[in-house]
A protein has these predicted regions:
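Transmembrane alpha-helices and adjacent helix-loop boundaries
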Residues: 2-277
Length: 277
């Protein structure tokens, strides 16, 4: 067995008990029942769409136009740009919050703990309304890109701070004590011993958090930023095709999230880490 595989099994077994034959049989039965139920629901929905005329060519023909897909591609690029920028900001801010919360300075610990809980507890939509409605009253006007990106980043930073902290807590305490016995400073212990191992543990979870960031960008219509959802709303207005457009957009978002989740699972297998959900 490879080093990575052994590590992965050890970490996974530490959190979850491996299912036995009976449990695996129950899982297979439950999966089969779920698939049948989902298939039946899909058939029912399609039947209702057919009855109400939503499957008519009238509501789908514009998807044969190249301009439609170019318009959606522009929105997709906008979504990716916001998600990556917000994710990068959240990564840095989340790490800073974790470092502050685990520092020896009591006031800094308190401030970072309060900020972490605040960012985690407040929906990103409320942050967007604050940037969109409140800040302009104080003569602070930001481009629509930043009115969407910064709120999404703040909401994600609180979650990432806790993920970082979970990774740090997963590092064996004995390694820290050994480094202290050698006279290393706390900064060197943190950045040369603890963080490299912690990041290895949490990389899959960090990638998975990008799924949440992508979902949070769907409220871009509030600030009229031309992302995938905003451009979808334009198509709906122009062609009066709500169901067909939203179905296509849903498929695109599902594919995006599947790719991100597959990346997280791949990294998990390579690093031997366990995805925190």
């Amino acid at each position: 067995m490879s080093k990575h595989s052994s590590s992965a099994l050890t970490m996974r077994d530490a959190l979850y008990e491996a299912p036995g034959p009976k449990m695996r049989a129950k899982i297979r039965i439950g999966t089969a029942i779920s698939l049948v139920a989902v298939a039946a629901l899909v058939v029912l929905v399609l039947q209702r769409f057919y009855v109400t005329g939503q499957l008519s060519v009238h509501y789908w023909y514009f998807f044969t136009h190249l301009t439609t897909w170019k318009f959606l591609l522009a929105g997709f690029e906008g979504t990716v740009k916001v998600a990556l920028t917000a994710g990068a900001i959240a990564l840095v801010l989340g790490l800073a919050l974790m470092l502050g919360r685990t520092s020896d300075i009591k006031p800094l610990q308190l401030v970072c703990r309060v900020l972490t809980d605040f960012f985690r507890g407040v929906p990103s939509l409320l942050f967007i309304y604050f940037f969109f409605l409140v800040l302009p009253q104080y003569k602070i006007a930001l481009p629509s890109f930043w009115m969407l990106t910064l709120p999404v980043a703040l909401a994600a930073a609180g979650v990432l701070a806790e993920i970082f902290r979970a990774g740090v807590n997963a590092v064996p305490r004995g390694q820290v004590e050994a480094a202290q016995a050698l006279g290393l400073s706390k900064a060197k212990i943190t950045f040369k011993i603890v963080l490299p191992q912690a990041i290895r543990f949490i990389i899959p979870s960090l990638i998975s958090q990008l799924v949440v960031v992508v979902k949070d960008t769907t409220v871009a219509y509030v600030v009229s930023y031309p992302d995938l959802m905003q451009n979808a709303r334009v198509l709906i207005t122009n062609y009066d095709a709500l169901v067909s457009v939203y179905l296509v957009i849903a498929v695109i978002y599902i594919l995006m999230n599947v790719v991100i989740n597959k990346a997280a699972v791949y990294v998990s297998h390579k690093t031997g880490a366990t995805i925190i959900r």
